[in-house]
Amino acid sequence: MAPKPEVRRSPVAALLYGAPIGLLGGLIGLGGAEFRLPVLAGVFEYAARRAVALNLAISLVTVVSALLIRGGTLSFAPLLGLVPVIASMIAGAVSAAYVGTALVHRVSERLLERVILVFLVVIGSALIVEAFLPQDVPGLLPDALPVRVVAAVFFGLGIGLVSSLLGVAGGELIIPTLVFAFGVGIKTAGTASLLISLPTVAVGVLRHRKLGSFADRADLTRTVAPMGAGSVIGAVAGGFLVGVVAASVLKFVLGVILIVSAVRIFYR
């Protein structure tokens, strides 16, 4: 059945879906892009390739907004000691995002759906596992700078690939990596994640634009702009409500929801 543009892809619907997704993401410190993708493909009935591109564009809106908000409330001073790690992770992530975006346009829709399914199930499983892990843990990597730099590049490559193939900012991978591998505090990791995500997502969006993903301007006005606005509003509200519900419980529940949604929508 053909989608009903006036209902399924209306700006109001995009806003109303974006807000609760942003709210739930904000409660666990994420932007919610991994939860938007099933909505774009399942509810708004975009093909997988188009859904990934639009999700990435919305992710750019949320990352820029989050950086502006954090810049006015938090200090960037704690990041100074992480500059080599952040720069190395950006180098790897941007390189992989450039290549990954091209792959999105080269593989078949069916193969892309299978790849999306696998990644979403992995991310959902990671959320479930993370719900049972302590937040304050020593970094697994040694303090030797060369080791940390090389590791950051390789981590960045994986993060950039996932970002480009799912259209996500990558916070769901960057933050746990910084916390568990590099021993970074959760708040500092959240800010560093945004700095790493911004160039990664920007490169992906520019590549998608060059490859014609945003040729239909109606997608930008009816879906990207309102869903981006809703996601930002929801994320801000979620930030204020942190602690109302235990993050571990939310991660477990959202992990299960993500896996079920991914299987229902992308398993054909």
Located regions from the model:
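N-terminal transmembrane alpha-helices
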Residues: 18, 22-30, 56-59, 63, ...
